[in-house]
């Protein structure tokens, strides 16, 4: 059995529901230690939500001359998975990795345990061929990416920053491809800014509206205006910033009572053309103009990041072309990832992994034919980066 497939099956068999790593990181650490990696477990979070993080690093070989330098490339990812959903609806048990019709089924097969396995095997192959590389290699893994993401990658990044650790390049193994492995990579992500808006009125009998103030009616014109705002026009790398309402809560449950308040949850997905502060200011101005009695609580989930074409992007694009013949598409679409935390301490961050059509679904799977190319691409990226150091 191919090494990556075998390791992927070992990881899929572990029911690592957030925040339980279920031993996945130990399996990986045991593969990395013989290669010269120092492996450190960093735990965080309250007693009832204990998160396991792994930081593993192999130092570069000493440089031969002043003209040469060393760089640190980090593979980042998560060992945690989302719940399987109804087990009886699966083709196989979600934690019994099963091959059928050319596909490997199991929770985490695409998101993202196969990427983790491919990371490890790619590094094994690369270091076997180039044990004296000037490229330092790291692994940053967490069991808190699919959950609140408060005690995972962000905590490791804070610890590394406090130590003065410099990361030059980072590849996050998120499933970014669409139809074939390598057809799309993410060279950035939009920021996410959420808020809960509470608009106050006066509760009363629905037959006597003159004795009450309906907060839903009061806020409706403001919402209509906000829906029509052009927050920005995006740019060459990002689509325009979007504003979307996710939830509206109001009422007592009775059909004859005007509610006393309405609570509205909304979210911005914003480009580098806007800032959290500018969006907050502009939205508050609309609410003030409509003379609403309101409270607003903001939560910044992450700021946008962008890695423009350069050393890392070029190394990945070239590796994909070498392995698959595909000309990959650079994209910043989709949701957030832990790349937003890593970008704070690393100037070049990209995300690349297998097709994502089945992630978080019943019968999550990856095409077996995609597994070896994924491993080879990761290895070729290391080769490209290493070659650049000795050129």
UniProtKB/Swiss-Prot annotation:
<feature type="binding site">
    <location>
        <position position="111"/>
    </location>
    <ligand>
        <name>Zn(2+) 2</name>
    </ligand>
</feature>
<comment type="function">
    <text>Catalyzes the hydrolysis of N-succinyl-L,L-diaminopimelic acid (SDAP), forming succinate and LL-2,6-diaminopimelate (DAP), an intermediate involved in the bacterial biosynthesis of lysine and meso-diaminopimelic acid, an essential component of bacterial cell walls.</text>
</comment>
<comment type="pathway">
    <text>Amino-acid biosynthesis; L-lysine biosynthesis via DAP pathway; LL-2,6-diaminopimelate from (S)-tetrahydrodipicolinate (succinylase route): step 3/3.</text>
</comment>
<dbReference type="InterPro" id="IPR011650">
    <property type="entry name" value="Peptidase_M20_dimer"/>
</dbReference>
<feature type="binding site">
    <location>
        <position position="78"/>
    </location>
    <ligand>
        <name>Zn(2+) 1</name>
    </ligand>
</feature>
<dbReference type="GO" id="GO:0008270">
    <property type="term" value="F:zinc ion binding"/>
</dbReference>
<feature type="active site">
    <location>
        <position position="80"/>
    </location>
</feature>
<dbReference type="GO" id="GO:0008777">
    <property type="term" value="F:acetylornithine deacetylase activity"/>
</dbReference>
<dbReference type="GO" id="GO:0050897">
    <property type="term" value="F:cobalt ion binding"/>
</dbReference>
<protein>
    <recommendedName>
        <fullName>Succinyl-diaminopimelate desuccinylase</fullName>
        <ecNumber>3.5.1.18</ecNumber>
    </recommendedName>
</protein>
<dbReference type="GO" id="GO:0009089">
    <property type="term" value="P:lysine biosynthetic process via diaminopimelate"/>
</dbReference>
<dbReference type="GO" id="GO:0019877">
    <property type="term" value="P:diaminopimelate biosynthetic process"/>
</dbReference>
<dbReference type="InterPro" id="IPR050072">
    <property type="entry name" value="Peptidase_M20A"/>
</dbReference>
<keyword id="KW-0220">Diaminopimelate biosynthesis</keyword>
<feature type="binding site">
    <location>
        <position position="174"/>
    </location>
    <ligand>
        <name>Zn(2+) 1</name>
    </ligand>
</feature>
<keyword id="KW-0862">Zinc</keyword>
<comment type="subunit">
    <text>Homodimer.</text>
</comment>
<dbReference type="GO" id="GO:0009014">
    <property type="term" value="F:succinyl-diaminopimelate desuccinylase activity"/>
</dbReference>
<keyword id="KW-0028">Amino-acid biosynthesis</keyword>
<feature type="binding site">
    <location>
        <position position="360"/>
    </location>
    <ligand>
        <name>Zn(2+) 2</name>
    </ligand>
</feature>
<keyword id="KW-0479">Metal-binding</keyword>
<dbReference type="GO" id="GO:0006526">
    <property type="term" value="P:L-arginine biosynthetic process"/>
</dbReference>
<feature type="binding site">
    <location>
        <position position="146"/>
    </location>
    <ligand>
        <name>Zn(2+) 2</name>
    </ligand>
</feature>
<feature type="binding site">
    <location>
        <position position="111"/>
    </location>
    <ligand>
        <name>Zn(2+) 1</name>
    </ligand>
</feature>
<feature type="active site" description="Proton acceptor">
    <location>
        <position position="145"/>
    </location>
</feature>
<dbReference type="InterPro" id="IPR005941">
    <property type="entry name" value="DapE_proteobac"/>
</dbReference>
<dbReference type="InterPro" id="IPR036264">
    <property type="entry name" value="Bact_exopeptidase_dim_dom"/>
</dbReference>
<comment type="similarity">
    <text>Belongs to the peptidase M20A family. DapE subfamily.</text>
</comment>
<keyword id="KW-0457">Lysine biosynthesis</keyword>
<dbReference type="Pfam" id="PF01546">
    <property type="entry name" value="Peptidase_M20"/>
</dbReference>
<dbReference type="InterPro" id="IPR002933">
    <property type="entry name" value="Peptidase_M20"/>
</dbReference>
<keyword id="KW-0378">Hydrolase</keyword>
<keyword id="KW-0170">Cobalt</keyword>
<dbReference type="Pfam" id="PF07687">
    <property type="entry name" value="M20_dimer"/>
</dbReference>
